[in-house]
């Protein structure tokens, strides 16, 4: 497929996402809102977009106000829709839930509508990350050439739909991206970087090349069987824990956008019990269960690469 055809499909898919989101928000407003609870988080400024989040103050919104914020959030796709001071790199998050009363027919209609939106979002992400054939550093420029000001994460982010929950509880998750690597895999990656010299601020091209050579030597000095692990922290994120009474099970969802909960009164479902979201404080985290970590030694800080001792 030619680059021109891909761009045509990219634009066409994005326009469909916009149209279907507009139709969904209109459709939801035709349904009876049983309960709504969302939590706005402080906006991240451009100056603070790379700073660690040690505290997050939560503001709660209820009822129609919560619904208005949520429906606007689903369609928040461009930086032009937000304050000029707000970071375009930090994700815009609005945890919470909207609960609507449905019958069998309207439940199926909304399920199909949301499924279609999520399919389009997945297709759009696939075009950008895979079909474009571009490295991650080049994708930003390519996407914004065709869709100026797009917040790609918001375009990728799918909607979460749940049916007939009994209880919904919110909380915070501290996570790491974990990837196990062999010594030879890391050496191969470093070799590719060495073969494509470039400058990386604040280093000159020569300084960066010297830094890569030192890293290569450090890895090459390890035994071939050395166990290496990338353990990169991800910024704390809101989560929702859903309890289904009939199935006697709990399901946890990431909750960057309000969950849509359909309450089917044809099946005798009732309004769920919805909890709040506490302020986040990194110095006051309580772990339910924290297994003993494997001893690791940091070997390449910029890659968050560790070796198991």
Swiss-Prot record:
A Pfam family per the record: Ter
One GO CC term on file: cytoplasm
Keywords: Cytoplasm, DNA replication, DNA-binding
Location of the protein in the cell: Cytoplasm
BP-aspect Gene Ontology terms: DNA replication termination
Regions annotated as coiled coil: none
Example GO molecular function: DNA binding
Family classification: Belongs to the Tus family.
Function of the molecule: Trans-acting protein required for termination of DNA replication. Binds to DNA replication terminator sequences (terA to terF) to prevent the passage of replication forks. The termination efficiency will be affected by the affinity of this protein for the terminator sequence.
Protein name according to UniProt: DNA replication terminus site-binding protein
Species name: Salmonella paratyphi B (strain ATCC BAA-1250 / SPB7)
